[in-house]
Amino acid sequence: WSELMSRAFKDQTYEWTPIGSMEDLNSADLGYAQEFYRKYYSPDNAVLVISGDIDYDHARKLTEKYFGELKPANTKKNSYAEIIYNQGEVSDTIYDNVQLPAVYIAYKIPGLKHKDAHAVELLSMILGDGRSSRLHNEIVYKKKIAKTTGAFVWDNEIGGLLIVYSTGFKNSNTDSMISAITSIIDDISTSQVTTRELDKAKNTIEKDLTSGLQTVLGVGDALASYWTFFRNTGKINNAVNEYLDVTIEDVQNAAEKYLKKENRVVLTYLPKEKKAN
């Protein structure tokens, strides 16, 4: 993650992972940790959800009892610059403690509140979700140049990544893997996805969203997320329809807009002994 993010978002938000690095943790003193806690761990920067078969009045009394005395920090919300796209392809090779060669290609995409967000997620599923996906069918089944492949989105408030990955065999040629992936990306960017592909992706999304609401925990987590990012818990009732409303043209436009070579990072991972050779 850190290798992709530091290259994709250089000098931008998300250049480093939210959890930080061991260097960050080791350099932080007690005073810094206490100030961070006071600034961010406050009731005006938190969302409390109580879900389940509860008595509303009793739950409110308990909330006031245990949390009512906590004072707001009045911390101003951080402002972040917009993500910069199409800054030129970044390519690098990393020799690490891996047994098999692997390729990661990441395209910068808009945040989860952007109008293209759902189209981008469906696009990633058409590319690399399951054995019938374009990537698996071409790279694993037909060309047999990789053991595994797939695609997914890493989405955040103002930006994210559509990540394509592929793990090769011991003697796989990573340049061939990158070339094959690029060919599939180019094809989906210049020709429309099929109705069948889009319907399959939508069905998977609908199943995942509805199954996630089958438990009290799932409902509570969804409500908290919708309020945190959208200030709208009502989205829990129309989230599925927002995906179902995405058209083939929406997916096509997203592919053309974001799946560009100048908008991506290409990382090749090779075993350390390859460098020695």
Question: Which stretches of residues belong to each language-model region?
Answer:
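M16 family metallopeptidases and their MPP-like homologs
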Residues: 1-23, 45-51, 101-110, 140-245, ...
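An aromatic/glycine/proline-enriched structural segment found at the starts
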Residues: 10-11, 18, 23, 43, ...
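Short, charged, amphipathic alpha-helices and their helix-cap/turn boundaries
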Residues: 25-29
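Solvent-exposed, non-transmembrane alpha-helical starts
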Residues: 61, 113-117, 173-177
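Active/ligand-binding-proximal structured segments within catalytic/core domains
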Residues: 105, 115-127, 134-137
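PPIase-associated folding chaperone regions across multiple families
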Residues: 118-122, 140, 248, 255
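In a subset of proteins, long, contiguous C-terminal domains/tails are tracked
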Residues: 245-277
